[in-house]
Amino acid sequence: MDGAIIGIVCKNDNVSEPDDDTTIKEKTYPEPNWIKWPAIKKPNFSHGKVLSDIRTHIDDGGYYNDSDLITAGHETTHGINSVIRNKFYQGKPTNAFYCLEDRAIILNEPKTRIEVVAREVPRSLRGGVYDLYLVQQAASGWGDRALYLCDEWVSYT
C-alpha cells in the first residue's frame, strides 16, 4: 500500500554539525505497519462519505455523536485511534491512526517528548492551538507521546 511517512524532527543538542560540506546521512526507518481496519456496521450516508466512513469503524453507542459534524468526526477518529492503539499494544509505546477507507497505521512512539517538539516550532508559527496541544496536553500526561500531535492532525483531517 502506498502512503507517506510522517516524521517529527527534533534538534539533538548533543550532536555537532559538520564544519565542512559533509553529507549527513538520513536514518532509515522500517516501513510502518499498515493494517486493514474493516467497518463494523453499515454506513449511513446522510452526513457525507467521510463522516459515514468514520462512524462505521467504531461501536461507541453514540458516545461521540455531536450536533457539530466536524466535532463528531474529530472525536470519533480519536476513539477509533484509541481502540486500534489498545488492541495492538505490545508493551512498548505505540500509536495508531485510522486513515479512512478501512486503512490504519501503527507506529512506535519516537523517543522524544512533546516539549522537545514544541521548542522547535518557530514563534511565528505558534498559532491558536500551539498552547493547547504542545503545552497543556504535554503537561497533562501526553508529554512522552509525541505522536499525540499526529493523532490530533489525523483527527482534524
Spans of model-derived segments:
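Short pre-active-site segment immediately N-terminal to the catalytic Zn-binding motif
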Residues: 54-71
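Active-site recognition of the HExxH zinc-binding catalytic motif
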Residues: 70-86
